[in-house]
UniProtKB/Swiss-Prot annotation:
Organism expressing this protein natively: Dictyostelium discoideum
UniProt keyword DNA repair, yes or no: yes
RNA-binding as UniProt keyword: no
Name listed for the protein in its UniProt record: DNA damage-binding protein 1
Pfam families assigned: Beta-prop_RSE1_1st, Beta-prop_RSE1_2nd, CPSF_A
Compartments reported by the entry: Cytoplasm; Nucleus
Biological or metabolic pathway of the protein: Protein modification; protein ubiquitination
Classification of source organism: Eukaryota, Amoebozoa, Evosea, Eumycetozoa, Dictyostelia
Length: 1181
């Protein structure tokens, strides 16, 4: 079994954020980390502008910006959970990431810290301290006497090993790897590394102090009696030992958790019930309501104000009132609500970035005056979607169109939500008219002051690329049919048919639009070009084709017109003085023209086009002509026998592209060099199986491409990389941007039998819709298809003790519910409140033997009272749907198990009590299998002759496990995922019992399992690895048949809670076999797919992966092979039978020369590799 792992959605949870001057001396940057990648933003007057992101081969544990003497830019220090570290810089002239130093901080002896890895940097940039192992402090001395010239000169001397990163995910990255173990001190940043002993074993936090001549650290630690204290240490000049520091403080409070350095000197000791300032001489304190502070940031350079965020999502400010560097008093005030923060970064002018791993990250502004309506100083400026942590998810084909969507339980506590995630872009319909046979649609704006469609528009290839380029309001929509043209007038939301006096209405229109600077409308038909006064709608000029000829194709750009008549290419211009139509040039081509485009590359610029591009029949070529002479400057054979059907010139992120589509669903992409008038970087990809028509459209001040075909697709650019997102529409024949008073920022969409006005989703690879859970956290979710609803287990955390810190031992109360939501509207239908101390752990729809009609809902719970622990299985029926928005009115009375079965409410039918928690429920062949701690129970719901009613019963059917967390089934087999004993395979016997037939003997802590097929099974384990095991059916040895052999392993690098069979893509009609795929979602908010591939594909991609590792070097010198190697507490082994699809996909973005190097040992061309990658990717993501 061979597997291809590809990320559909990269991590979204923010773990760290820092600010500084990283990309340039005058740049203000925000840098955030999301588990395995960093994102760099530029702060300007318009807000945060994304610059680029970089993948890191490791889970980021420390992210710090620092400066050294003589450097105008800051450096970035990164440390990973696997003890790798690096120091990065940015060359703002070359626009490249540079690795200044890197190394491995792992020690052969030592116990990793229980409190997590800590990394701190001296405020003066002299030294880095890493606390990775108990009792040890690793010191990395920084050379703080270098000038920028010294850094650059040294870097140039190592130029052969320093081929650095561009903006596109580690493309062509080579880094200097300074091997710490070999004491390589050539780095101008890092001088040496030493381990020093630290007396304190249970370190909770540490920080460098400001204003110290010698680097000095403060350490918050816990002793054997759980008392907490602070020690300070000076680092000796030789960096080989710690010297007792200037002060210490005992018994700082059992709830102390954070140390915050203060530029005035000293530290803030942050506890759950207060904040204290200490500097060895002065102590100042302020009490706060009981909470748990999670993140902080300094506001002022002198440290007189700090912002704090807590686990309730409250933002507060601490003010240090001081006189002459002496802190006199602390004042604390709550400012407002934010997402539960993992990081806080103060940007400028009251603007603050809130990074969150619990909910959406935010950009907020702090106001000087409180908003009395919200009782808050906070204004929300922008939200950044985060779907992590994904606790559970289900895969549903809600629209029965063959394309699934994921519905996740995302976020924690008050940031909890359901997220509906689907591949592609949706259209929200606003109005629809039944109109059959529409051949073209053209918006006309309200007046001649602005123009919505001033650039190229073609007929048969329908490149109405400029529709909606400006922001003027559209008043009319011209609709063209085979034998007539109609004008639709829009007054608000009212639509009616009208007429223009000068418009030819008794024939089909190839193009209609406005020439704003000439106050004209232009209409082009098969026989004429008509100019119409845009005020009076009277015709002012006309050009007619010869009676024996017909216009086939047309494209325009303001007063420029090109059209084709058979083999002839004609170029016209509109005379601005007398508003006449002038033929400038006509040439005859060797073959008929199949597509044409005259649009300027930058559609926002009101400039004349210098080029016209065409596609030809017969010789299947793309040709480019210079205007106004129509001199041919480039000829590009496309190959094959399929005609080019549409052509388009466009600029994305200042890169000029020419797209040419074919009649079989393929698309050619070229880059164009204006200086040499040459095409280069030819790529061919597949968008569908039917002819593709390319159209430009505008959305939020960006121009994108709508590719009309059997799989409509939007082509857009992000960070100079092109993306292709499927649009969830069928039977589309034409589209254009449309922006009227009644339908602002919309799209007009023609199908085979209707005209629709709608708004388009935000353009991105995945569309994510948020359903808030009203400050509840979703824990488990299932879809009940028979009842058209979702069942969700939620948890609500009630904020207790807000009035003070007097009862610190009391826990925040958690209440668990079962919520039922309509699967279309997500309205709350019904609710059931679980008992006190009871938590829902598992939920599943089920059917029982002898009852094929009813679908029941089963819920497994855990009850943890102060006295004992136990669990229940609850069996519900669900009546017909109704909706209500009042959750309290829907909650059951828990003292009455026979709560009402009225419409839309859950009815509790039966319950079974167990002595332990019920961690998982599985519907299995007409019964319910319950995982109750170490045992499996079979639950049946049958009719009792004695009681003359249905009764529930259970029996133990298997034992011998440690703790069963997950189950999966296929036919008569059950796969068991044990917390400590890996995976085992059970088979159903004729008497209903379960017998173990094989197990994996490795000590692997399983988190989730799935059955790939009858013989291969996959598990996600606690150290962020995948493992694939195989059933030994063919072995003649009985002992071997009882083992599940490990045949595949791979480090995914993220914690996986759930795996489900399914796919996010709508597969095109094809004779190719369907590729089995399993979707997974992570705690960090990523979504990925594991696809089973053939041995032939595996061999090919293994060789390509090896070639890419020679070309694509990891940032910081981190190794891809090391990163993907299976690793847990017991051993580390190389990845086996897995392909890193993310690395493979980087091939698509490499320059051609790098692609040649990557495929050098494969004996194929880059184009062959490109097509093979695209062929696989379209089936799995």
């Amino acid at each position: 079994m061979y597997n291809f792992v590809s990320t559909v959605q990269k991590p979204t949870s923010v773990t760290h954020s820092v600010t500084g001057n990283f990309t340039g001396p005058n740049d203000k940057n925000l840098i955030i980390s999301k588990c395995t990648k960093i994102e760099i933003f530029l702060m300007d007057q318009d807000g945060l502008k994304p610059m680029f992101d970089v993948n890191i081969y490791g889970r980021i544990s420390v992210l710090k910006l620092f400066s050294v003497a003589g450097s105008k830019q800051d450096y970035l220090f990164i440390s990973t959970e696997s003890f790798k570290f690096c120091i990065l810089a940015y060359d703002y002239e070359k626009k490249e990431i540079i690795t200044k130093a890197s190394g491995n901080a792992e020690d052969t002896i030592g116990r990793p810290t229980e409190a997590g890895q800590l990394g701190i940097i001296d405020p003066d940039g002299r030294i880095v301290a890493l606390h990775l192992y108990e009792g040890l402090l690793k010191l990395i001395t920084l050379d703080n006497n270098n000038t920028p010239n010294k850094i650059n000169n040294n870097n140039n001397n190592n130029n052969n090993n320093n081929n650095n990163n561009n903006n596109n995910n580690n493309n062509n990255i080579n880094n200097n790897n300074f091997n710490i173990n070999n004491n390589n001190n050539n780095s101008p940043i890092q001088k040496n590394v030493n381990n020093v002993r630290l007396e304190e074993l249970q370190v909770l936090d540490m920080t460098f102090l400001y204003g110290c001549k010698v680097p000095t650290i403060a350490v918050l630690f816990k002793d054997t009696k759980d008392e907490k204290h602070i020690s300070t240490y000076e680092i000796s000049s030789k960096d080989t030992e710690l010297v007792v520091g200037p002060w210490s403080q005992s018994n700082v409070g059992v709830y102390s958790s954070l140390l915050v350095p203060v530029p005035l000197g000293g530290v803030l000791v942050v506890a759950d019930n207060g904040i204290t300032y200490l500097n060895g001489k002065v102590t100042r304190s302020v009490a706060v309501s009981y909470t748990k502070f999670l993140a902080f940031t300094r506001v002022d350079k002198d440290g007189s104000r700090f912002l704090f965020g807590d686990h309730f999502g409250r933002l507060s400010v601490l003010v240090l009132i001081h006189q002459q560097q002496k802190v006199m008093e602390l004042k604390f005030e709550q400012l407002g609500r934010i997402s539960i923060p993992s990081s806080i970064s103060y940007l400028d002018s009251g603007v603050v970035y809130i990074g969150s791993s619990s909910g959406d990250s935010q950009l907020i502004r702090l106001n000087t005056e409180k908003d009395q309506t919200t009782d808050s100083y906070v204004t929300y400026l922008e939200a950044f979607t985060n779907i992590g942590p994904v606790v559970d998810f289900c895969v549903v084909d809600a629209e029965k169109q063959g394309q699934a969507q994921i519905v996740t339980c995302s976020g924690t506590y008050r940031d909890g939500s359901l997220r509906i995630i689907r591949n592609g872009i949706g259209i929200a319909e606003q109005a629809s008219i039944e109109l059959e046979g529409i051949k073209g649609i053209f918006p006309i704006n309200n007046n001649n002051n602005n123009n919505n469609n001033n650039n190229n528009n073609n007929n048969n290839n329908n490149n109405n690329n400029s529709n909606g380029i400006t922001d003027s309001k559209d008043r009319y929509l011209i609709t063209s049919f085979i034998e007539c043209t109609k004008v639709l007038s829009f007054q608000g939301e009212e639509i009616e048919e009208t007429e223009f006096e000068g418009l030819e209405s008794n024939c089909s229109t190839l193009y209609c639009g406005t020439i704003d600077k000439l106050n004209l409308l232009i209409q082009i038909t098969n026989v004429s070009i008509n100019l119409i006064d845009s005020n009076t709608f009277k015709r002012v000029s006309q050009w007619n084709v010869e009676p024996s000829r017909r216009i086939n194709l047309v494209s325009t750009n303001q007063d420029q017109i090109v059209l084709s008549i058979d083999k002839s290419l004609l170029y016209f211009q509109i005379n601005s003085s007398n508003k006449s139509i002038q033929l400038v040039k006509e040439i005859e081509l060797p073959h008929e023209i199949s597509c044409i485009d005259i649009s300027p590359f930058d559609s926002f610029m009101d400039t004349k086009s210098q080029l016209v591009s065409v596609g030809l029949w017969n010789d299947i070529t793309l040709r480019i002509f210079k205007l106004p002479t129509l001199e041919e400057i480039w000829k590009e054979p496309l190959g094959g026998e399929i005609l080019p059907r549409s052509i388009l010139m466009i600029s994305f992120d200042s890169i000029d592209y020419i797209f040419c589509s074919l009649g079989d669903g393929h698309l050619f992409k070229f880059q164009f060099d204006f200086s040499s008038f040459k095409l280069f970087d030819k790529r061919k990809l597949t968008l569908g199986t039917q002819p593709i028509i390319l159209k430009k459209f505008k959305l939020k001040n960006t121009i994108n491409i709508f590719a009309i075909s059997d799989r409509p697709t939007v082509i857009y650019s992000h960070n100079k990389k092109l993306f292709y997102s499927v649009v969830n529409l069928k039977d589309v024949t034409n589209v254009t941007s449309f922006n009227s008073d009644g339908f602002p920022n919309s799209m007009a969409i023609a199908t085979t039998n209707s005209l629709t006005i709608g708004t388009i989703d935000e353009i991105q690879k995945l569309h994510i819709k948020t359903i808030p859970l009203n400050e509840e956290m979703g824990r488990r979710i299932v879809h009940l298809e028979d009842h058209s609803c979702y069942a969700v287990i939620t948890v609500k955390n009630n904020e207790g003790l807000l009035g003070g810190a007097q009862d610190l031992c009391e826990e925040d109360e958690e209440v668990s519910y079962i919520r039922i939501y309509n699967d279309q509207t997500f309205e709350l239908i019904s609710s059931y409140k679980l008992d006190p101390y009871e938590m829902g752990w598992s939920i599943t729809p089920c059917k029982f033997a002898g009852d094929d009609v009813n679908t029941y809902l089963a819920v497994g719970t855990s009850i943890n009272t102060p006295i004992k622990s136990s669990g229940r299985v609850l069996l519900f029926s669900l009546s017909s749907s109704s909706s209500s928005n009042d959750k309290d009115s829907l909650d059951n009375n828990n003292n009455n198990n026979n709560n009402s079965g009225a419409n839309g409410k859950l009815t509790l039918l039966e319950e079974i009590k167990f002595r332990s928690s019920v961690y998982f429920l599985l519907s299995f062949n007409g019964r319910l299998i319950a995982a109750v701690h170490k045992r499996l129970f079979s639950i049946r719901y049958t009719h009792s002759k004695e009681k003359n009613c249905k009764v529930i019963s259970s029996e133990s059917v298997h034992k011998g496990h440690t703790m069963i967390l997950k189950l999966a089934s296929r036919g008569h087999f059950i796969l068991v995922g044990d917390m400590m004993k890996s995976m085992s395979l059970l088979v159903e016997q004729s008497d209903g019992s379960l017998e173990q037939i094989a197990r994996n003997p490795q000590p692997i802590w399983i988190r989730s399992v799935a059955m790939i097929n009858d013989d291969y099974f996959i598990g996600a384990e606690a150290s962020n690895n995948f493992i694939v095991v195989k059933k030994n059916n063919d072995s003649t040895n009985e002992l071997e048949r009882e083992l599940l052999d490990s045949v595949g392993h791979y480090h995914i690098g993220e914690s996986i809670n759930s795996m489900r069979h399914g796919s996010l893509v709508r597969l095109p009609d094809s004779d190719q076999p369907i590729i089995p795929t399993i979707l997974y979602a992570s705690v960090n908010g990523s979504i990925g797919v594991v696809a089973s591939i053939s041995e032939e594909d595996f061999i090919f991609f293994s060789k390509l992966q090896k070639g890419l590792n020679q070309v694509v070097r990891g940032v910081g010198g981190f190794s891809h092979e090391t990163w993907r190697a299976f690793s847990n507490d017991h051993h580390t082994i190389d990845s086996k039978n897995f392909i890193d699809g993310d690395l493979i996909e980087t091939f698509l973005d490499l320059k051609y020369e790098s692609q040649l190097k990557a495929v050098a040992d494969l004996g194929i061309t880059p184009d062959d590799a490109f097509r093979r990658i695209e062929s696989l990717m379209q089936y799995i993501r």
